C-alpha cells in the first residue's frame, strides 16, 4: 500500500464494509442511539447487583459537586467513618473546604519554590512549561492531604462549611493561576537578575500575602479555635470548647496517618514491582510529607484490600473512572459496553500499554467499602463515590473485578497488614524513592483537574 490514501484503497474498504454481515444493523443502532447505548451489555448490569459478602456500613455519600476534590473527599470519608460510629454521628462530615483552603495556599508556595529552583532553565523547557501549565489545581494525592492535616489539623464541616468557590471551583482556579503565573515570571526574573535568596524570598512572601487574601475572600478565613457543639444520634447534647484543628484531629479522628501508605499497580517496564516511587514536582507542603508509592502486583493489592476490609477499615483508591462506566447506573465494568462486537474491531490493550500510550491514567479517587467473594475469589466491589446520592445505588457504585484489573491503579493500605517482605521493600525505598517524570500517569490524579 502507498503511503497516501487513494481512491482504490477507499473503494476496497467500502466493498469490505458492504460485505460485512452486521454493518446495516450496527450502523442503524449506533447512529440512532450513540455508540455506548448501542453497545451496552444488559447481562453485565444484571451481574453487578449490589450484594456483597463483606460490607462496611458507611452511611450517606458526600458530594464534591463541580470541583476536582475527589481525592480530598474520599480521604476525609475514610477518616469520618470511624468517627461517625464512635461518637454516634450518622451524617457527620469533616470540612473539605478547610483542607481545600490550606491545600491551595500550600500549592501556591510549592509552585513558587519550584519556579525559583528552575529559574536557570529556559521557559520552553518541558519541565518549566509543565509547572506553568497548571500552577495549582483541585487535584491531589493521599500523601498531600496527610501533609495538610499533619500541619493544620481538621475541623467539622459545620464549623467551616462549603462556599460557592469550593463547590464550583473553576473561577477560583482561574483567578489563582493567573496570579501565580504572573508572580512566577517575576520570581524567575529576580533570580536571573542575580537578586539574593533573601530578596527573592521576601518578594515571594509578599506574593503569598496576595494569595492568602484571594483565598480568604473566596472561601473564608480558617478558624484557629472553635467549639465543637453537636447532638448525637441519641439526641444527647455535647460541647467541646476552644479546641484547635489539630486537637480536634487527635481527639476525634486519631487516624495514624504515618502508618497508611500508598500502593500502586503500574505494570510498565519502567516501574519494577516492590520498589518505591515518587513523581517530580508532585506535592503541596514544602518541607512536609513526600508522595510515595509502593508498586505491587494487582493480586497483591487485592489481597491487602480484602484483608483491610475484613479488619473493618475502608480503602481509599485511585482509578480511571471515565473508562467503561455508567454514572447514572453506578456501574464500572469492562464488559459494560461491547464496542468490539458493535464494530467488529479489537480494542484490547494491556494495562501497561494503556499507561504507556496515554489511553488510561488515574482521574478519580473513591473508597472501597465492600467486596463479594465467591469460591474464594473477588467478583465485584462496593464503591463509595463523592458525587452525592443521585447516581448509582444512592451514591454507591458497583465495580466488577475485571474493571479493577484494568483501571484501578492505587490503594492506601494500613502498613500493619503488609507482609514482612513488602514492609521491608517499603522501608528500604521510602527515603530515596525512584523519581518519575512530572507527567507520568501515576501523578495524573493530582494534575488532571
UniProtKB/Swiss-Prot annotation:
The reply on keyword rRNA-binding is no
Q: What GO biological process terms are annotated to this protein in UniProt?
A: homocysteine catabolic process; proteolysis; response to toxic substance
Q: Which reactions fall under this protein's catalytic activity?
A: Inactivates bleomycin B2 (a cytotoxic glycometallopeptide) by hydrolysis of a carboxyamide bond of beta-aminoalanine, but also shows general aminopeptidase activity. The specificity varies somewhat with source, but amino acid arylamides of Met, Leu and Ala are preferred
Keywords of this entry: Aminopeptidase, Cytoplasm, Hydrolase, Protease, Thiol protease
What Enzyme Commission number(s) does the record list for this chain? Answer: 3.4.22.40
Locate the active site: 70, 364, 385
User: Highest taxon of the source?
Assistant: Bacteria
Q: Name one Pfam family in it.
A: Peptidase_C1_2
Q: Return the GO cellular component terms, semicolon-separated.
A: cytoplasm
Q: Where in the cell is it found?
A: Cytoplasm
Could you give the subunit structure recorded for this chain? Homohexamer.
Per the similarity annotation, which family is this? Belongs to the peptidase C1 family.
Q: What is this protein called?
A: Aminopeptidase C
User: Per the UniProt entry, what species is this protein from, by scientific name?
Assistant: Lactobacillus helveticus (Lactobacillus suntoryeus)
Amino acid at each position: 500500500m502507498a503511503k497516501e490514501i487513494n481512491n482504490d484503497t477507499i473503494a476496497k474498504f467500502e466493498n469490505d464494509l458492504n460485505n460485512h454481515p452486521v454493518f446495516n444493523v450496527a450502523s442503524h443502532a449506533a447512529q440512532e442511539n450513540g455508540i455506548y447505548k448501542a453497545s451496552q451489555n444488559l447481562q453485565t448490569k444484571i451481574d453487578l447487583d449490589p450484594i456483597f459478602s463483606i460490607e462496611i456500613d458507611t452511611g450517606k455519600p458526600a458530594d464534591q459537586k463541580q470541583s476536582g476534590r475527589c481525592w480530598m473527599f474520599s480521604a476525609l470519608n475514610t477518616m469520618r467513618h470511624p468517627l461517625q460510629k464512635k461518637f454516634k454521628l450518622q451524617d457527620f462530615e469533616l470540612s473539605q473546604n478547610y483542607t481545600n483552603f490550606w491545600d491551595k495556599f500550600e500549592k501556591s508556595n510549592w509552585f513558587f519554590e519550584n519556579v525559583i529552583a528552575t529559574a536557570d532553565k529556559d521557559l520552553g523547557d518541558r519541565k518549566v512549561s509543565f509547572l506553568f501549565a497548571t500552577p495549582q489545581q483541585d487535584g491531589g494525592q493521599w500523601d498531600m492531604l496527610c501533609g495538610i492535616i499533619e500541619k493544620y489539623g481538621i475541623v467539622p464541616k459545620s464549623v467551616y462549611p462549603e462556599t460557592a468557590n469550593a463547590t464550583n471551583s473553576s473561577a477560583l482556579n482561574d483567578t489563582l493561576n493567573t496570579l501565580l503565573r504572573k508572580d512566577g515570571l517575576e520570581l524567575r526574573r529576580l533570580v536571573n537578575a542575580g537578586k539574593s535568596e533573601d530578596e527573592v524570598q521576601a518578594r515571594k512572601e509578599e506574593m503569598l500575602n496576595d494569595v492568602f487574601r484571594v483565598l480568604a475572600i473566596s472561601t473564608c478565613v480558617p478558624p484557629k479555635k472553635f467549639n465543637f457543639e453537636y447532638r448525637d444520634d441519641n439526641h444527647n447534647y455535647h460541647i467541646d470548647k476552644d479546641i484547635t484543628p489539630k486537637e480536634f484531629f487527635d481527639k476525634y479522628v486519631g487516624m495514624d496517618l504515618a502508618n497508611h501508605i500508598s500502593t500502586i499497580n503500574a505494570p510498565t517496564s519502567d516501574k519494577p514491582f516492590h520498589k518505591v516511587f515518587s513523581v517530580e514536582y508532585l506535592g503541596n507542603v514544602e518541607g512536609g510529607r513526600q508522595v510515595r508509592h509502593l508498586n505491587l502486583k494487582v493480586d497483591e493489592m487485592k489481597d491487602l484490600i480484602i484483608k483491610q476490609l475484613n479488619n473493618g477499615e475502608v480503602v481509599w483508591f485511585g482509578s480511571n473512572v471515565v473508562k467503561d462506566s455508567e454514572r447514572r447506573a453506578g456501574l464500572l465494568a469492562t464488559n459494560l459496553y461491547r464496542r468490539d462486537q458493535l464494530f467488529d474491531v479489537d480494542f484490547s490493550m494491556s494495562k501497561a500499554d494503556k499507561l504507556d500510550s496515554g489511553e488510561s491514567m488515574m482521574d478519580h479517587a473513591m473508597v472501597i467499602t465492600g467486596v463479594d467473594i465467591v469460591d474464594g475469589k473477588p467478583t465485584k466491589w462496593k464503591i463509595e463515590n463523592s458525587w452525592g446520592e443521585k447516581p448509582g445505588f444512592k451514591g454507591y457504585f458497583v465495580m466488577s473485578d475485571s474493571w479493577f484489573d484494568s483501571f484501578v491503579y492505587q490503594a492506601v493500605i494500613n502498613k500493619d497488614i503488609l507482609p514482612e517482605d513488602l514492609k521491608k521493600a517499603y522501608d528500604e525505598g521510602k527515603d530515596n524513592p525512584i523519581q518519575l517524570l512530572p507527567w507520568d500517569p501515576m501523578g495524573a490524579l493530582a494534575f488532571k483537574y
